[in-house]
């Protein structure tokens, strides 16, 4: 899992020695067949094999980032694009059971791109009440000679009970620089004068343009081809999981939701089929023992894109 890299490259890799050290932190379906205690847990296995071993109604929040409906390699595995109806059947093969893991007041976020978004909405509406669709702007992405560059992804937000679910608006307000700092009788009007300049706290919308996709110079970067930013996961977790609650990440990949949950004082259960990605996630979780920082979040408010 290592190779020749620039000294400035901060991508997280796992050495053979680290793999031996980290392996005891990763469970298998056999390890949890007698029941799972809710110490923070990372399980290496096929989601369909693991779901039946997990109790119902344990998660305050589910963040599901399944393979999008495109042909793509994920480590040793690969996913192939398929007709929409077949992709929806694939989603149903695990989504219904994942929803049973939510508490009665739980929330679920389901990630996708423009190709899969309509299928995600359709399948989610069969099990949950859809409250919103978040669209977030990616900085990465290839241009196209005869089409618009694909620079957006979607996250569908659903709940079990639309009359009773957790949502903490104050925890996810965005700290934005004020370009026209008007004053009222000499005092700031709806903004705060700080040593760094004028800022205003704004309510988050369902369009996010303040998230940076991890790249080689960021300390959270990994070799996973579809890694989600910790900042993005932190927004979902702070909004929809109370302190001390449980976050379930059924397609953990390199563990962004699990890591963000740990840094923010939540518990987590992550399931990932690829052993190498489990090791990367385990290393990130170990790093989070001593470093709770999340880029773009100061511990109180979220900052604009590319803020430290």
Question: What is each of the regions a protein language model found here?
Answer:
Residues 28-37, 282-298:
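Short, conserved SAM-binding/catalytic segment
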Residues 1-22, 26-280:
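Core catalytic lobe of class I
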Residues 44-49, 298-305:
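Conserved SAM/SAH-binding loop
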Residues 169-173, 292-302:
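Short, flexible loop/turn segments with low-complexity composition
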Residues 279, 287, 300, 305-308:
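Long, positively charged, glycine-interspersed low-complexity recognition regions
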